[in-house]
């Protein structure tokens, strides 16, 4: 199974990249994790619709056809660790490759969000982009550890 994280925004602080790399190397070979950063559309005097369209095109270009699309959205479904572990297990059981999408500073195109298979949120708090990436990869690893009976997650 492949987990693809598509994130709008390319430059992350060193600490965020270090944290991402640390968690990414922990995943087992049967659960391939990949990060694809896509360029943020410069705001300038462009309308929000123009920004959304440009970023949506880049996001869709990064996602292989047939992947389950899960967007991170502040209004998405809140999940516990166990619920995320159950989702991960279901995706694996169905043989789905999953693209998890993190929007840019202006969020994601509303039509793209509406067309996604699922919308989840990481927190009720507003998170900086770098923190969202790190939190997502940590929670995905934690979900895997719950399913694998690995001692990383403790109740």
Swiss-Prot record:
Enzyme Commission number(s) from the entry: 2.1.1.177
GO MF entries: rRNA (pseudouridine-N3-)-methyltransferase activity
Q: Oligomeric state and partners?
A: Homodimer.
What are the record keywords, sorted?
A: Cytoplasm, Methyltransferase, rRNA processing, S-adenosyl-L-methionine, Transferase
Q: What does this protein do?
A: Specifically methylates the pseudouridine at position 1915 (m3Psi1915) in 23S rRNA.
The reply on keyword Coiled coil is no
**Which InterPro entries does the record associate with it?**
Alpha/beta_knot_MTases, RlmH-like, tRNA_m1G_MTases_N
Binding positions for S-adenosyl-L-methionine per the UniProt entry: 72, 103, 122-127
What does the organism's lineage look like at the top? Bacteria, Pseudomonadati, Pseudomonadota, Betaproteobacteria, Burkholderiales
Q: Could you give one GO CC term from the UniProt record?
A: cytoplasm
Q: What class of enzyme is it?
A: transferase
Name the family the entry cites.
Belongs to the RNA methyltransferase RlmH family.
The organism is Variovorax paradoxus (strain S110)
Q: What is this protein called?
A: Ribosomal RNA large subunit methyltransferase H
Task: Give compartment(s).
Answer: Cytoplasm
